[in-house]
Design a protein with these regions (language model features):
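Terminal targeting segments of Actinobacterial cell-envelope proteins
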Residues: 1-26
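Solvent-exposed, non-transmembrane regions of membrane-associated and secreted proteins
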Residues: 21, 27-28, 38-252
Length: 252
């Protein structure tokens, strides 16, 4: 009597190919998962590291170009309309142009000679700190409002949570230095555009103070709200006649 043949004895029986195909499918899925994992790791590395490298290089280029423009007579730059600000005149910047440098001693590892550009569009925020074009210029009555990334793309305001009431923010323009003192902060909705009004929270009010507003995303990796800091102008220096602010001199 002939013994029964099992799939373990004869690979030609129907059960064997099904098992082989199943293991092949598992292998393909495993390779796909590994590939996806590698791609995700590369994307994370790009976001967390490489975008900062690119942004830092772009910011350095903006600083070099801005300081070069300051070394030439204003009439040779072809800049926009001049407006009276603080100790002298500033040229109203063109959209996308860098026009100031910002220094925050508390955040000196990130914001020390950081360029301020006339734009809050994403490509420009990857080159420095952005100035809301509809708000006032440094030293002007009203609200000099700026925005910056807190995560990736240079992340100038990464450590906004370290800021404290009384901290100083310095803004350098062609002919002047401005010192602002931080007064208060608040977490708001992304739709709360009133935070950059000339008089925040008082629509239509005529400004009498010279304010600064720092805006950034919150929480750092979720960006569901906005972290706002307001400050007031506390001092000005004319580059032609005054010495450097002590905090700037100490930091150099």
């Amino acid at each position: 009597m002939t013994a029964a043949v099992t799939s373990e004895q004869d690979p030609q029986v129907p059960g064997a190919p099904r098992a082989s195909r199943a293991w092949a499918a598992v292998g393909v899925i495993g390779e796909l998962l590994i590939t996806v994992g590698v791609v995700l790791l590369l994307f994370v590395a790009y976001q967390l590291w490489w975008t900062n490298v690119v942004a830092d290089r772009a910011a350095d280029q903006q600083v070099i170009a801005l300081q070069d423009s300051w070394s030439r007579p204003p009439s040779a730059q072809g800049e926009g309309e001049e407006v009276q600000e603080g100790n002298g005149k500033q040229a109203r910047p063109k959209l996308g142009d860098a026009f100031a440098l910002m220094y925050i001693p508390r955040l000196s590892d990130k914001v020390w000679g950081m360029p301020v550009l006339e734009s809050v569009e994403l490509p420009d925020l990857a080159r420095g700190i952005g100035h809301y074009p509809e708000t006032q210029l440094p030293g002007q009555k009203g609200n000099f409002a700026v925005a910056a990334h807190r995560a990736t793309n240079g992340e100038p305001f990464r450590d906004v949570d370290r800021l404290q009431v009384g901290d100083k923010v310095y803004v350098e323009v062609r002919d002047s230095w401005f010192e602002y003192t931080l007064k208060r902060d608040q977490i708001v909705s992304p739709q709360d555009g009133w935070v950059i009004d000339p008089v925040p929270g008082e629509p239509g009010a005529k400004p009498v103070e010279r304010l600064i507003t720092l805006t950034t995303c919150n929480p750092r990796w979720a960006s569901t709200t906005r972290w706002i800091w307001w400050g007031e102008l506390s001092n000005t220096w004319d580059k032609a006649t005054d010495k450097l602010p002590a905090a700037i001199k100490a930091g150099r």
